C-alpha cells in the first residue's frame, strides 16, 4: 500500500490499436481478444518497483475514437507519462501519430514523458510498419520507443516500467516539480511524512520536497 | 407579482411601459456609450432592476450584457455587475418565497433564458475564461452564474464544458481557492457539473478531486463539520455512484482508509446536531456506494476486503453496538454493515465474532435479531436487521450451519441462560405479530438458501408445544399455522420458507408429503375461488405443490409424481393450476422485490416478497409448468433417457480415461522418439564432422606435400616472402636432420637391445645347461660379467635417452618459437605489401606455406612422440631383461647352496670311511692277535674296492 511516488499515466492512440489490452495485460496479466470500445476513459492501477522504491502507477486508458477526443484532452495536463500507441499492422495508425503528438504536446505539461509503442508485434506476418520506422519517428521527436504485444505480454511490463524509470530520472534531475500535483506526480504518504520529520536522512533524491 | 404575470400574458399595461422604456434606455447606453463609467452605471442600474423586472431585463439586456463580458474584461466592476444581472435573470433561487403557482412560471423563465444564453456555446466558454480571473468580484458571481446554468439545463451545459479545452480542469481549480466562499460555491458548481455525467465525473476525479474533498472534510472536522462537509459528501457521491472506474480509482488511491476516521464517533458526545446526523448519513451512504450489491462482484469484494483491513468495518460495528446513536443513523449503519459483509467470508466471520458490550456479552447477531422480532422497534430498523442477517448468510455456508445448529437438539443450551439466534427465529415465526412471522420466516429461509445439508438438518428440529403434548417438528408446525388461516403476511412468509426448504431437497418433500393433511390443504387452497387478496397465497400454494412434484423422488406410494399430477388434473385442472402459479410473478410487489436485495419497503403492508425468493420463483416457474404438462409416459421416457444418458456418460468417461492414459503413453513415446532422434542426429553430425575432419587432414597433408615441393621451387623467386620466412625452411631442414639423427640413434639403440636380448638368451641357455651338468661354479663369473656389461649398456642407453629427450624438448621449444615467428611474420606481411592484390596473394601464399610448415612441425612432433614411445618400449624391455637377470641370479644362488651342501655330505662320508677303515684295521689286528685266519682280508678288500669306487665318484664331483 505504501508507495514512494505516484505517477499518473495516460494511454493514447487511434481506436483499436490495443490500448485497453495493454492496460489489462499490465494490471491483470491477461489478454482479452474481444474488447468493448472504451467509452471516454477507464482507470487502472498497479504497483511497480524502481531502484528499490515502490511506485504506484495510476493509468487512464482513453478512448481512441475521434468523438471522445475532447474528453480525453482533459487528461493530458495532469499526466506525468503518456503511452502513445499505434498498431504495426495498420499504417494509418502510424500516420496519425503526428496529430496525436501535437495534441499531447499542446495540452500536456512540457515535461511529460512520452513512450511510443508499436503494438501487436505478434502479428509479424501482417506487419505494415517496420520497426525501423517507429524507431526513426521516436528519434525524430525525442520519444522512447518499444514494440509490444498485449497478446503475448512481450515488452508490456517494460513499456510501463521504462516510462516510469524515465520519469524517476527526471525527478532525480530536478526537472519535475514534485510538489505540484498537476504534473501527475505525488510523493507517497509515508515518504512525505519521513521527509518532514527527518528530512536529512532521506535527503538526496527529494531534497526539494521536504525542505522548502 | 401581478405585474409580472401581466407581462407574461403579453398584455402590456401603462405603468410597465415606462419600466420597459427605462430598461431600453439603459440597454442603449450600455451598447452605445463610449465612456466606461457610463456603461458601468447603466449595467449597475440594470442589475438593480433585474430582480424585479426579470423578464424585461432578460429579454432586452442579455445580448448587451454578454457583449460587456466580451469587451470590458479589463474592468472587473462592470463585469461583476453584468454577471450579477445575468445570474438574477437566469437563477430561480431568489424566487423561492414566491407562491406556488408563479414558481412554475419562473422555472420556465430560468430555463428559457438559459437556453438563450447557451445557444451560443462561446458564451459558456467566455464564462469559463472569466473564472480564471482571480478577482473575487468576477470569480464569485461567475461561479454562481455557471452553477445556475448547470442547474437549469444540465446536459447541454455539461456538454459545452466538456468540449471546451481544459474546461473541467479549470473548474477543478476552484477547490484550491483560498477564499472559502469561492471554494464552497465551487463544490456546489461541481455537484451540478458532475450530476449523471460519467465522463465529467472521471475528469474531476482525475484532477485529484478525491484528495481535495477528503482534505476539506478532514479540515472541517469530519461529521462535526458544517454544511460544507455535506456538500463535499454529496459531490463525492456524485463522483462514485455507478461509476466503476472512479470507484476503482478511489480504492486504488487508498482513500477507503481515510473514511475510517469519519466513523470514530465518541460515546461522550450525547448531542447529535441535525447537521451531524445528515453528514454521518451521507458518509454511510458513501460506504454503501462502494460495496453496493449492484456493483461488479470483483469491485465490491476488493472494497470489502479493504474495509476490513483498514478497520472501517470494525469501526462501523462499534457504532452498531454503541448506545445513544440516533435510530436513523443506527438503521443506516446496520444497512452499511450488511453490505460491507455481504458475500465476503472474512467480513462475515468477523461479524459473527462481534459481541455486544452487555453482561454477559451477547453476539451482535442475537442482539440484532431481538430487535427484528420486537414489535416496538421502528419498522425501518427491523428491515435493516433482516437485511443484515440476510447479508451475513449470503454465500456463507458456515454461518448458515451455525444458525441452524442453534436449533438442533444436541446443541441447544440446556441451562437456557442465553437466548440463541435459532430460539429468537422460532419465537418470531410463531409470535402473534405478523411482521415478526414474515421476517423470521424469510431469515430462516436464508439460512437454507442453496444449502442442501442445512435443509436436511432443519428437518430434525422438534418443538415443544405445551406440556403433556408430544413435540412437533418445525415443518409440521409451519404447515399447522398455515392451515389455521392467519394474516396474509404470515402465510406468505411461511409459504416462502416452505418453498425454499423443499426446493432441491427430496427428503424434505417426502417429510412434507408424509403429513396427509398437507396435500388436501394445498389443493383446496388452489382450487377455491377466492378474492383477489388470496390470489397470492393461491399462487404460492401452487408453487409449493409444484415443488412437491418436481423434487419428488417417488418414495411415498400415495404421493408419487404421477399421482400428484393426476390430482391436479382432477381437482384443479392443469390450465387453472398454471394460471394460479402465474399469480406470483404478476404481483405488483414482485418486480419491486426482484430489483434489489435490500428489503426496502415504504410500510409494513408492502412487506410481501423477499429478493432471493423472487430468484427462486424465476428459476422454478418454467420447470414446474413443463413438469405439469408432461404426461407420465414422457416422464418415464425421460427417465429412461436419463438412465441411458448416464450409461453413456459412464462409457464416455471410461473411454475418456482410456484416451487420457493412451495420450500419456503416446506423449512418453513421442518424447523417447524425439530424444532418440536427437541422439541419432548428434551422432550423425559427429560422424560427418569427423569424416570431414579426416578429409581436411588428408587434404592438408596432400597440400603440404605439394607445397613442400613447391616451396623449394619458389623459394628463390619469392624474395619478399622467402626473406621473411627464409629462416623456416632452414630450420625445418635442420629439424629433419636432427630427426634423422634421432632415428639413427634409435636404430642403434634397437640393435643394442637386440644384442642384449641375445645375451639374455645366452644367459638363459647357459643356466639351463649349468643345471644339468652340476658345474655351476664356472657359470657364475661369466654371468656376472654379462650382467655388468648389460648394466653398462643400460646406463649408456639411459644417458642417450636423456640427451635425446633434452634434444626433443629443445626442438619443441624451437618449434614453438618458429611458430610464433611465423605468426608475427604472417601478421607483418600484409602491412609491408605494396599493392593490395599482390600482398593478398602473397599473404595467402605465405599463409598456405605457414600452415604447411605447421603441419610439418606437427608431423615432426608426432615422430618425436613415436620416438619417445619407442624409447619407453625399450626401457620396458630393459626392465624386463633386468628382472630376468635377477631371477637367474637367484637360481644361481640356489645352485651354489646345493653344491656346498653336497660337498659337506661328501666330507662327512670320507670321515666316516676313514673311521671305518680304522675300525677294520683294528678289528683285523685283534683277529690276528686272537689267531684267527685272515682270509676275510679279501672280502674286506673287495669291500674296500667298492668304497674306493664310490670315493672316486665323489672326487670326480669335487673336481
Curated annotation (Swiss-Prot), chain A:
Residues 2-19 are annotated as: Required for interaction with PRKCI. One of its GO terms (cellular component) is perinuclear region of cytoplasm. It holds the Pfam family Ras. This is Ras-related protein Rab-2A. It is found in: Endoplasmic reticulum-Golgi intermediate compartment membrane; Melanosome; Endoplasmic reticulum membrane; Golgi apparatus membrane. Keywords: Acetylation, Cytoplasmic vesicle, Endoplasmic reticulum, ER-Golgi transport, Golgi apparatus, GTP-binding, Hydrolase, Lipoprotein, Magnesium, Membrane, Metal-binding, Nucleotide-binding, Prenylation, Protein transport, Transport. It is an enzyme of class 3 (hydrolase). Its main location: endoplasmic reticulum. Belongs to the small GTPase superfamily. Rab family.
From Swiss-Prot, chain B:
Residues 638-930 form a coiled coil. Residues 1-637 are annotated as: Globular head. The modification Phosphoserine is found at residues 50, 940. Residues 935-959 have a biased composition (Acidic residues). Gene3D superfamilies: Leucine-rich Repeat Variant. The modification N6-acetyllysine is found at residue 202. One of its GO terms (cellular component) is cytosol. It is a peripheral membrane protein. InterPro entries: ARM-like, ARM-type_fold, Armadillo, P115_Arm_rpt, Uso1_p115_C, Vesicle_P115, Vesicle_Uso1_P115_head. Signal peptide: none annotated. Phosphorylated in a cell cycle-specific manner; phosphorylated in interphase but not in mitotic cells. Dephosphorylated protein associates with the Golgi membrane; phosphorylation promostes dissociation. Composed of a globular head, an elongated tail (coiled-coil) and a highly acidic C-terminal domain. Homodimer. Dimerizes by parallel association of the tails, resulting in an elongated structure with two globular head domains side by side, and a long rod-like tail structure. Interacts with MIF. Interacts with GM130/GOLGA2; interaction is disrupted upon phosphorylation of GM130/GOLGA2 by CDK1 at the onset of mitosis. This is General vesicular transport factor p115. It comes from Rattus norvegicus. The gene is Uso1.
Amino acid at each position: 500500500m505504501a508507495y514512494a511516488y505516484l505517477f499518473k499515466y495516460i494511454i493514447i492512440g487511434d481506436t483499436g490499436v490495443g490500448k485497453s489490452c495493454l492496460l489489462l495485460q499490465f494490471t491483470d496479466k491477461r489478454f482479452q481478444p474481444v474488447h468493448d470500445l472504451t467509452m471516454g476513459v477507464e482507470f487502472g492501477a498497479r504497483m511497480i518497483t524502481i531502484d528499490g522504491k515502490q511506485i504506484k502507477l495510476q493509468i487512464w486508458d482513453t478512448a481512441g475514437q475521434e468523438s471522445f477526443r475532447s474528453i480525453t484532452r482533459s487528461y493530458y495536463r495532469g499526466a506525468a507519462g503518456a503511452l502513445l500507441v499505434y498498431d504495426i499492422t495498420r499504417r494509418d495508425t502510424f500516420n496519425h501519430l503526428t496529430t496525436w503528438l501535437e495534441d499531447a504536446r499542446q495540452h500536456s505539461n512540457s515535461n511529460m514523458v512520452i513512450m511510443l509503442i508499436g503494438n501487436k508485434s505478434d502479428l509479424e506476418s501482417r506487419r505494415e510498419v517496420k520497426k525501423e520506422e517507429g524507431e526513426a519517428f521516436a528519434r525524430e521527436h525525442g520519444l522512447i520507443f518499444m514494440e509490444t504485444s498485449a497478446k503475448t505480454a512481450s515488452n508490456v511490463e517494460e513499456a510501463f516500467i521504462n516510462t516510469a524509470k524515465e520519469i524517476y530520472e527526471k525527478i532525480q534531475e530536478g526537472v519535475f516539480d514534485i510538489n505540484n500535483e498537476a504534473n501527475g506526480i505525488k510523493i507517497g504518504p509515508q515518504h512525505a511524512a519521513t521527509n518532514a520529520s527527518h528530512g536529512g536522512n532521506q535527503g538526496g533524491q527529494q531534497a526539494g520536497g521536504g525542505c522548502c | 407579482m401581478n405585474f409580472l404575470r401581466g407581462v407574461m400574458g403579453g398584455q402590456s399595461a401603462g405603468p410597465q411601459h415606462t419600466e420597459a422604456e427605462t430598461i431600453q434606455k439603459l440597454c442603449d447606453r450600455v451598447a452605445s456609450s463610449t465612456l466606461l463609467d457610463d456603461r458601468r452605471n447603466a449595467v449597475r442600474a440594470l442589475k438593480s432592476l433585474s430582480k424585479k423586472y426579470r423578464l424585461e431585463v432578460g429579454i432586452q439586456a442579455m445580448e448587451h450584457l454578454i457583449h460587456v463580458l466580451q469587451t470590458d474584461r479589463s474592468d472587473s466592476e462592470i463585469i461583476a455587475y453584468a454577471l450579477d444581472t445575468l445570474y438574477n435573470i437566469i437563477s430561480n433561487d431568489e424566487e423561492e418565497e414566491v407562491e406556488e403557482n408563479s414558481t412554475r412560471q419562473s422555472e420556465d423563465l430560468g430555463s428559457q433564458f438559459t437556453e438563450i444564453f447557451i445557444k451560443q456555446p462561446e458564451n459558456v466558454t467566455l464564462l469559463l475564461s472569466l473564472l480564471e480571473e482571480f478577482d473575487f468580484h468576477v470569480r464569485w458571481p461567475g461561479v454562481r452564474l455557471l452553477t445556475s446554468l448547470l442547474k437549469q439545463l444540465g446536459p447541454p451545459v455539461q456538454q459545452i464544458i466538456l468540449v471546451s479545452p481544459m474546461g473541467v480542469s479549470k473548474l477543478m481549480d476552484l477547490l484550491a481557492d483560498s477564499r472559502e466562499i469561492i471554494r464552497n460555491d465551487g463544490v456546489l458548481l461541481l455537484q451540478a457539473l458532475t450530476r449523471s455525467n460519467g465522463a465529467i465525473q472521471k475528469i474531476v476525479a482525475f484532477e485529484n478531486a478525491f484528495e481535495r474533498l477528503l482534505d476539506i472534510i478532514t479540515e472541517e472536522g469530519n461529521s462535526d463539520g458544517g454544511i460544507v462537509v455535506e456538500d463535499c459528501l454529496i459531490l463525492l457521491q456524485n463522483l462514485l455512484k455507478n461509476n466503476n472506474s472512479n470507484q476503482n480509482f478511489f480504492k486504488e488511491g487508498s482513500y477507503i482508509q481515510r473514511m475510517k476516521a469519519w466513523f470514530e464517533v465518541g460515546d461522550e458526545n450525547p448531542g447529535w446536531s441535525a447537521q451531524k446526523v445528515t453528514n454521518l448519513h451521507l458518509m454511510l451512504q458513501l460506504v454503501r456506494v462502494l460495496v453496493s450489491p449492484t456493483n461488479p462482484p470483483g469491485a465490491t469484494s476488493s472494497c470489502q476486503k479493504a474495509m476490513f483491513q483498514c478497520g472501517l468495518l470494525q469501526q462501523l460495528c462499534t457504532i452498531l453496538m454503541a448506545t445513544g446513536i440516533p435510530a436513523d443513523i443506527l438503521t443506516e449503519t446496520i444497512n452499511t454493515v450488511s453490505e460491507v459483509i455481504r458475500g465476503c467470508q472474512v467480513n462475515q466471520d468477523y461479524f459473527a465474532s462481534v459481541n455486544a458490550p452487555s453482561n454477559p456479552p451477547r453476539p451482535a447477531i442475537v442482539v440484532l435479531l431481538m430487535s427484528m422480532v420486537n414489535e416496538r422497534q421502528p419498522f425501518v430498523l427491523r428491515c435493516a436487521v433482516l437485511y443484515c442477517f440476510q447479508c451475513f448468510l449470503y454465500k456463507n455456508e458456515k454461518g448458515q450451519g451455525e444458525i441452524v445448529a442453534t436449533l438442533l437438539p444436541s446443541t441447544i443450551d440446556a441451562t437456557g441462560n442465553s437466548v440463541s439466534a435459532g430460539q429468537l427465529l422460532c419465537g418470531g415465526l410463531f409470535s402473534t405479530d405478523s411482521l415478526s412471522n414474515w421476517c423470521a420466516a424469510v431469515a430462516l429461509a436464508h439460512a437454507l438458501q442453496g444449502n442442501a445439508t442445512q435443509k436436511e438438518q432443519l428437518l430434525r428440529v422438534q418443538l415443544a408445544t405445551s406440556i403433556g403434548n408430544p413435540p412437533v417438528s418445525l415443518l409440521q408446525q409451519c404447515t399447522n399455522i398455515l392451515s389455521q388461516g392467519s394474516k396474509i403476511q404470515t402465510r406468505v412468509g411461511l409459504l416462502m420458507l416452505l418453498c425454499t426448504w423443499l426446493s432441491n431437497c427430496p427428503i424434505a418433500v417426502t417429510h412434507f408429503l408424509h403429513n396427509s393433511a398437507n396435500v388436501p390443504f394445498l389443493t383446496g387452497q388452489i382450487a377455491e375461488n377466492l378474492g383477489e387478496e388470496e390470489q397470492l397465497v393461491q399462487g404460492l400454494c401452487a408453487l409449493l405443490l409444484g415443488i412437491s412434484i418436481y423434487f419428488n423422488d417417488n418414495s411415498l406410494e400415495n404421493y408419487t409424481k404421477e399421482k400428484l399430477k393426476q390430482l391436479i388434473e382432477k381437482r384443479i385442472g392443469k390450465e387453472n393450476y398454471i394460471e394460479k402459479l402465474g399469480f406470483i410473478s404478476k404481483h405488483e410487489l414482485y418486480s419491486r422485490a426482484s430489483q434489489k436485495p435490500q428489503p426496502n419497503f415504504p410500510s409494513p403492508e408492502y412487506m410481501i416478497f423477499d429478493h432471493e425468493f423472487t430468484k427462486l420463483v424465476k428459476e422454478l416457474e418454467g420447470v414446474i409448468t413443463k413438469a405439469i404438462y408432461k404426461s407420465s409416459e414422457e416422464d418415464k421416457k425421460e427417465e429412461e433417457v436419463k438412465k441411458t444418458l448416464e450409461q453413456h456418460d459412464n462409457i464416455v468417461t471410461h473411454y475418456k480415461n482410456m484416451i487420457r492414459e493412451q495420450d500419456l503413453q503416446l506423449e512418453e513415446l513421442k518424447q523417447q522418439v524425439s530424444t532418440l532422434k536427437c541422439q541419432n542426429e548428434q551422432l550423425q553430425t559427429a560422424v560427418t564432422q569427423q569424416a570431414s575432419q579426416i578429409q581436411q587432414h588428408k587434404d592438408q597433408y596432400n597440400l603440404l606435400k605439394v607445397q613442400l615441393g613447391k616451396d623449394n621451387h619458389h623459394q628463390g623467386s619469392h624474395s619478399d616472402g622467402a626473406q621473411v620466412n627464409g629462416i623456416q625452411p632452414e630450420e625445418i631442414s635442420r629439424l629433419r636432420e636432427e630427426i634423422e639423427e634421432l632415428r639413427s640413434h634409435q636404430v642403434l639403440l634397437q640393435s643394442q637391445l637386440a644384442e642384449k636380448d641375445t645375451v639374455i638368451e645366452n644367459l638363459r641357455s647357459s643356466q639351463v645347461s649349468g643345471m644339468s651338468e652340476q658345474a655351476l661354479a664356472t657359470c657364475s663369473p661369466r654371468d656376472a660379467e654379462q650382467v655388468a656389461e648389460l648394466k653398462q649398456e643400460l646406463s649408456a642407453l639411459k644417458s642417450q635417452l636423456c640427451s635425446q629427450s633434452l634434444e626433443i624438448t629443445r626442438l619443441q621449444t624451437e618449434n614453438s618459437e618458429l611458430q610464433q615467428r611465423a605468426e608475427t611474420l604472417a601478421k607483418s606481411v600484409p602491412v609491408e605489401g605494396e599493392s593490395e592484390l599482390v600482398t593478398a596473394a602473397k599473404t595467402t601464399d605465405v599463409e598456405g606455406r605457414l600452415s604447411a610448415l605447421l603441419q610439418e612441425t606437427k608431423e615432426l612432433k608426432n615422430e618425436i612422440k613415436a620416438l619417445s614411445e619407442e624409447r619407453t618400449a625399450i626401457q620396458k624391455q630393459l626392465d624386463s631383461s633386468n628382472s630376468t637377470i635377477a631371477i637367474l641370479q637367484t637360481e644361481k644362488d640356489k645352485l651354489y647352496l646345493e653344491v656346498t651342501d653336497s660337498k659337506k655330505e661328501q666330507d662327512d662320508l670320507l670321515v666316516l670311511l676313514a673311521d671305518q677303515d680304522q675300525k677294520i684295521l683294528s678289528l683285523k689286528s685283534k683277529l690276528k692277535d686272537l689267531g684267527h685266519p685272515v682270509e676275510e682280508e679279501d672280502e674286506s678288500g673287495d669291500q674296500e674296492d667298492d668304497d674306493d669306487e664310490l670315493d672316486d665318484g665323489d672326487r670326480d664331483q669335487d673336481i
